[in-house]
Amino acid sequence: MDVNPTLLFLKVPAQNAISTTFPYTGDPPYSHGTGTGYTMDTVNRTHQYSERGRWTKNTETGAPQLNPIDGPLPKDNEPSGYAQTDCVLEAMAFLEESHPGIFENSCIETMEVVQQTRVDKLTQGRQTYDWTLNRNQPAATALANTIEVFRSNGLMANESGRLIDFLKDVMESMDREEVEITTHFQRKRRVRDNVTKKMVTQRTIGKKKQRLNKRSYLIRALTLNTMTKDAERGKLKRRAIATPGMQIRGFVYFVETLARSICEKLEQSGLPVGGNEKKAKLANVVRKMMTNSQDTEISFTITGDNTKWNENQNPRMFLAMITYITRNQPEWFRNILSIAPIMFSNKMARLGKGYMFESKSMKLRTQIPAEMLANIDLKYFNDSTRKKIEKIRPLLIDGTASLSPGMMMGMFNMLSTVLGVSILNLGQKRYTKTTYWWDGLQSSDDFALIVNAPNHAGIQAGVDRFYRTCKLLGINMSKKKSYINRTGTFEFTSFFYRYGFVANFSMELPSFGVSGINESADMSIGVTVIKNNMINNDLGPATAQMALQLFIKDYRYTYRCHRGDTQIQTRRSFEIKKLWEQTRSKAGLLVSDGGPNLYNIRNLHIPEVCLKWELMDEDYQGRLCNPLNPFVSHKEIESVNNAVMMPAHGPAKNMEYDAVATTHSWVPKRNRSILNTSQRGILEDEQMYQRCCNLFEKFFPSSSYRRPVGISSMVEAMVSRARIDARIDFESGRIKKEEFTEIMKTCSTIEELRRQK
């Protein structure tokens, strides 16, 4: 029977059909090869947007720098970075006037945070540029390396464990005439293999000391490493993102803390909240504009798009904003917040791995590292690359490009939102002093502008005024990509508004299915995704039930764990059938052991082990959750785990799911091939780091975990904790006198060894 597809929509309001317009199901595109070209594009574009600014030279590093601030205003639509300082300061003053005390209060909140934050805050985050090894590392390792180098250079303030003291070391390190670092290197030797008698290359990893003079150190401290942004949908071209080093990160964190505190108090800000809270905030602004426009006014909304937001922002402007926001605050606080924008005005972009060349005729491949781009003959490159390199050459120093203007992606999201909101704030009638007025929403570079006026000419005038005000602050609204509609229909940060926010269920499609972490986590994540979509995305009961059945089917095919009484033959069916036959209570078997599915839409919030616990055979319970069973991994599992979900659009979301440690929550082993590479030394460092942390956890289990008060090293904290615990256990009779004496002796020995060291 043929079905006319339009019939499907007869009963559906038009706005609900949005889910059918999303093509984002399969895997998103990933980048391959080097990001060098994309980074050069970013650097060149950024300079082009500010080209009529003033050139200066950095006295310390000799890097040429372009300063577009207070530069000539653009005559036409071209995007440009010529923000005017006095306009930015005035916008800040008006923002404060409409929100009395907002800056003052946020500063007080931030000051508390600054004094309490521990340096381990910097271990959060994924890849970080490690300046000691000149490449990316996990954040914790990069921090450990930085602190190790600081201490070997006599910078000891960081020992207190407070972030602000670590930052004092960073500042002092920049005044040093030279800094000594430890780097890893590889030795290759040709040796004869005893067994096969062939020559083989043997690699050994060494660590060596290296001295950096002030200039080289500053260049590294100010370097942002670049990578290609992965998994971006709907774009043909990839683009570069930056990872800053440990020197910059701490300062940025404090600036963003201040800006976040301000954003929380601004009704037009789409950050830092998310999800339903964000929708409620936005709906309020829309409601306000529509209520006031009922009789005499008309109301229009622009779904806005800014051209190259990051590349036209300027750290010098952020410095002006911070100087204004903190103007009545103590000197130390103002200094610490002004360092991030100053470092960003002097930043260097690392060009990445360089270019790969291959000669088809000679079957040769060779890599041209970024350091060589400054003086290599350009005849080897194609036209577009040649143009890029010619343009960037005057900016190059040691394989990094001087990039004073522009911000790089994702660095000051909160602070740039404050700048955007300050323009929306100027739309009140008391500032426009005319018949039109505006309000709107801002979330980093995304905005929606609602304009009210008595007639169309007024709307046009309002939009023009908004557009020109943005230009004064270095924000470029794109006339090509923004569009205007009657208020009631617009899109903002991938939320579609049509008389209320429309649930766009298809955005979540990529996160349905089996994640491939392990049997335990996958089951838990799968049902949590369905539960969350019932709560947030209008996933109805019938569809949810169907999604659940499809998920279970998918799960069984992935892990080859079809029910014990099925006819399907897989590699595991022999074991599963055997287990099925010898189990009395078959309903108690987990799905991953060939058991039946007991989930329905009412019990999705319960972990499967808990759901079936009462139904399990006793010996099955014993095997499944026995802490002495070597296959039960307790090491990774806390009561709540986090999975990273990738929706079709927008940032990866952190999703919490419950997990129970069982024989199914295994953690895969590391790939062996890393052990033969230069990474090996780092891996060993990382494992040592891990062991120390695990040991510390044993002494301070999370249930009783209060941060050790006062300034003590990890060892001192553990020794004093061991003494206290031993005394309590001895006095309550839990341990014998001999054991107590032995513990005390061990503690003294450890202290003695530390003194000798």
UniProtKB/Swiss-Prot annotation:
Domain RdRp catalytic residues, every copy: 286-483
Positions occupied by motif Nuclear localization signal: 187-195, 203-216
Location in or out of the cell: Host nucleus; Host cytoplasm
Positions of region (Promoter-binding site): 249-256
Post-translational modifications reported in the UniProt record: Phosphorylated by host PRKCA.
Reaction(s) the record says it catalyses: RNA(n) + a ribonucleoside 5'-triphosphate = RNA(n+1) + diphosphate
Protein name from the UniProt record: RNA-directed RNA polymerase catalytic subunit
